Curated annotation (Swiss-Prot):
Binding site for ATP: 17-25, 43, 129, 131, 136, 194
Protein name: Argininosuccinate synthase
Classification via NCBIfam families: argG (TIGR00032), PRK05370.1 (NF003779)
GO cellular component, one term: cytoplasm
Keyword Amino-acid biosynthesis: yes
Pathway assignment: Amino-acid biosynthesis; L-arginine biosynthesis; L-arginine from L-ornithine and carbamoyl phosphate: step 2/3
Gene: argG
Length: 448
């Protein structure tokens, strides 16, 4: 059964994810004029650059929407963001600086909650503003069909009739003006921005060129920490977790996760914390580049991982990182609610996050420059007295360590035999430049 409609389904209800921008405004008006019955759905994701959400549905009605609804997605989005922190669901990093998958998290929430609202209204055709070259077209496709199995997809930007008439921003602006709406294009920026309460993404246009740095970006969630004229005084902040959940900042307990995230954004944003420049692989395997902001997510992530390293053992931490990278890829690909992702997510939340109770104090400076000042938890397995270099009681003696080292002789002998075998087959050279044990000095295999 075909789920993607290439041409406008005249006379039928179409739900459009309506942002109020030029693209979706022109698309909604065009669909109404061509005989479709558009319904507008706007997601309140707590975008830091959106001033008046209530105005957006009103504009949609003016442009011809049969009905327009504002869906508050903030609570669910913050819940998914905290879940991603608990699981370390982040796979794009550059030299230890992380992209917190804030756009994929936003798409997971938008794609399910808007389609669920459409289904309530008897709307089974969905359109949005994603293009065929990007990730969002697949993310929305997956989340939409997961939510409504009867869903069909119509995107004006895949309809040649729409593209022929309104293929560019200039044409769309003139179309709106001719219809009596006097829509003026905003000044063109050197890049495009997409944001939600968890973070902001800046990409495309000038940022497609790698010689355009973060310095051309005007942050919307923080300060230009690279600008020496911007004063950024150092600041200490304490973050408290209970059973993996952030509950307090600087001693203030929050019962509302949305308010906690907003405060975390304010604290981190004062320093430009969480900004990163990433080259990543899109779902279609083509590489793209983005500049990201996520001050609150970064603040919570740093504190959470500090507690993880102090509470859990090495094998558990290794599994946490491995599963987190895999889960981050699933999230990026629009598979956050697939069974393989739910399995990894449940594992981390159940066995790792549940033990994370404690407080971490950080000193924030400029950008991602910070120091960990203190770590406190009743669950810490870090016990300095176990490994103290000072004289005193110890949990093990010198003789105990001699016995432990003696047991290592077994695997050391095995390794030496393998090195000898590698030398015999030519895999190892006896050259001193290899940095490996001099194979010529190994005992003859027959003598072992």
């Amino acid at each position: 059964m075909t789920t993607i409609l290439k041409h406008l389904p005249v006379g039928q209800r179409i739900g459009i994810a309506f942002s109020g921008g030029l693209d979706t405004s022109a698309a909604l008006l065009w669909m109404r004029q061509k005989g479709a019955v558009p319904y507008a759905y706007t997601a309140n994701l707590g975008q830091p650059d959106e001033d008046d959400y209530d105005e957006i549905p009103r504009r949609a009605m003016e442009y011809g929407a049969e009905n327009a609804r504002l869906i508050d997605c903030r609570k669910q989005l913050v819940a998914e963001g905290i879940a991603a922190i608990q699981c370390g669901a982040f796979h794009n990093t550059t030299a230890g600086v992380t992209y917190f998958n804030t756009t994929p998290l936003g798409r997971a929430v938008t794609g399910t909650m808007l389609v669920a609202a459409m289904k309530e209204d008897g709307v089974n055709i969905w359109g949005d503003g994603s293009t065929y070259k990007g990730n969002d077209i697949e993310r929305f496709y997956r989340y939409g069909l997961l939510t409504n199995a009867e869903l069909k997809i119509y995107k004006p930007w895949l309809d040649t009739d729409f593209i022929d008439e309104l293929g560019g921003r200039q044409e769309m602006s003139e179309f709106m003006s001719q219809a009596g709406f006097g829509y003026k294009m905003s000044a063109e920026k050197a890049y495009s921005t997409d944001s939600n309460i968890l973070g902001a993404t800046h990409e495309a246009k000038d940022l497609e060129f790698l010689n355009s740095s973060v310095k051309i970006v005007n942050p919307i969630m923080g300060v230009k920490f690279w600008d020496e004229n911007v004063k950024v005084p150092a600041e200490e902040v304490t973050i408290r977790f209970e059973r993996g959940h952030p509950v307090a900042l600087n001693g203030k307990t929050f019962t509302d996760d949305v308010e906690l995230m907003l405060e975390a954004n304010r604290i981190g944003g004062r320093h430009g914390l969480g900004m990163s420049d990433q080259i990543e692989n899109r779902i279609i395997e083509a590489k793209s580049r983005g500049i990201y902001e996520a001050p609150g997510m970064a603040l919570l992530h740093i504190a959470y991982e500090r507690l993880v390293t102090g509470i859990h053992n090495e094998d558990t931490i290794e599994q946490y990182h491995a599963n987190g990278r895999q889960l981050g890829r699933f999230l990026y690909q629009g598979r956050w609610f697939d069974s393989q992702a739910l399995m990894l997510r449940d594992s981390s939340q159940r066995w790792i996050a549940s033990a994370i109770t404690g407080e971490v104090t950080l000193e924030l400076r400029r950008g991602n420059d910070y120091s960990i000042m203190n770590t406190v938890s009743d669950n810490l397995t870090y016990k300095p007295e176990r490994l103290t270099m000072e004289k005193g009681d110890s949990v093990f003696s010198p003789d105990d360590r001699i016995g432990q080292l003696t047991m290592r002789n077994l695997d050391i002998t095995d390794t030496r035999e393998k090195l000898f075998n590698y030398a015999e087959t030519g895999l190892l050279s006896s050259s001193a430049s290899t940095g490996l044990p001099q194979v010529g000095q190994l005992q003859d295999k027959a003598e072992k």
